[in-house]
Amino acid sequence: MEAVIKAFLTGYPGKTSKKDSKEKPLATSKKDPEKTPLLPTRVNYILIIGVLVLCEVTGVRADVHLLEQPGNLWITWANRTGQTDFCLSTQSATSPFQTCLIGIPSPISEGDFKGYVSDTNCSTVGTDRLVLSASITGGPDNSTTLTYRKVSCLLLKLNVSMWDEPPELQLLGSQSLPNVTNITQVSGVAGGCVYFAPRATGLFLGWSKQGLSRFLLRHPFTSTSNSTEPFTVVTADRHNLFMGSEYCGAYGYRFWEIYNCSQTRNTYRCGDVGGTGLPETWCRGKGGIWVNQSKEINETEPFSFTANCTGSNLGNVSGCCGEPITILPLGAWIDSTQGSFTKPKALPPAIFLICGDRAWQGIPSRPVGGPCYLGKLTMLAPNHTDILKILANSSRTGIRRKRSVSHLDDTCSDEVQLWGPTARIFASILAPGVAAAQALREIERLACWSVKQANLTTSLLGDLLDDVTSIRHAVLQNRAAIDFLLLAHGHGCEDVAGMCCFNLSDHSESIQKKFQLMKKHVNKIGVDSDPIGSWLRGIFGGIGEWAVHLLKGLLLGLVVILLLLVCLPCLLQFVSSSIRKMINSSINYHTEYRKMQGGAV
């Protein structure tokens, strides 16, 4: 650590050995700017003092112009990229700002490039036939404009140059383009892959980044130059994961193309395709269907049609080949030696050149490789704002209403006083109702105590979690700044112990889940203030409050009627027996009275 501090103070960010630092003084080099001292040397001090003295003597005074400090790094990131969320990765010490973003294809319109291109007229870029080539007559003309034509047109018209090369962003990956599985509904991003190469040739298809770099170093763009012109390889680092139909999309139907072939000895030439063997063998070797010039093409997918495989000057070995699934686009190669690509060009905000696991907010000078498409960047998982938007836009139908349970407030009594064994025994024997009431009261107070205790605990944990989160953010920002400064001054992983390995445990997600679980668990304790209404809501689902009150009234009336039906026979029997007793007693009274009168006579 002392050697690093010493090297930093002496102004030499380069790597020096201990032996050289002890034996020889460190010398500066005028040719290498990285060896220039960061702090003034003794000679520079003398020159500065002399200039100050001269200015004081002559009376010449100059205003001090303070350099404008750069803005916040993260705000600059958001303004330049249009991203409000991002994260850093420490997988590579040489790339401390590797992002955790992924690329997604996005529909491109000419209006998005207004102010960045010479003109936005890309309406005459041509079309792509998806069923038959134009050389086959009599068939359907099912044409559409794939996205790569519009992308190529706009990229060739970029006219806003950048001062420096656009910074490269290392992505976790990018989304593949969709396949064409429905010929009547082609996606707005289908066939959006483009490739960059000198003279717009398909020579570098499937090449790795390293292989392409080595080839271009040995073979310059211009054969007249003895040195290689500057170029930027835009092929993905993991190119084997971002190539072919798995990345650029595929055409799910057969494409019929005429093979007008000529024979020269044992070789055949069919347009741009040539080689030994019959063209029919080439077609069937790729899984296609061969139809010679004497037959008709009968196809049922994507719809039924019949076409004649005829043409002018067809040789004996000519015919039509129904090729299997074709990679899209068919030939989107852009010549990167044109004038518009000699300097880096700017792209509109929030639009990126995405090439697999690499992205640029602009077009580098003389790009070579691919495949690439224009799109946007997003987080691998939705952030909190996206989740809230999804919940706000989601359908609210079919939600089951909760019971009318009110939470315990802060004014409830939490004084728990339990009875002893003697009181419980006498109360349960002599007054069971009093014992039950006492038990219910103590249960309510225990619930109140539990709620208050849980609220205090969650509040305390919430404050601690906020403090830990703020400390974590500060530590990560400071560590990222320190690593960036050390790497910028040439210090690698071996200079500072633990520089490339920084383990800061992150249990915030687990803590947040448990914290939310505690809050939900507290809400499980409540008082059911309307048991009948809760029962009705549970039976009939999400009914309104007016329906609940109506059902409660009907239920009350039904209960009254049932009580009357049950009690009315008993009441009538009691009344009739009472009347009968009264009548019998009256009759008995009159009988006794008559007997008494008869005896008196």
Swiss-Prot record:
Cytoplasmic-facing ranges: 576-601
Covalent lipidation (S-palmitoyl cysteine), chain numbering: C567, C570
Record annotation: effect of changing C567G: Reduced palmitoylation level. Slightly reduced cell surface expression
Location of region: Fusion peptide: 420-440
Site (Cleavage): R403, S404
UniProt keyword Lipid biosynthesis present: no
Transmembrane regions: 555-575
Signal peptide: 1-62
Name of the protein: Envelope glycoprotein gp95
Chain's gene name: env
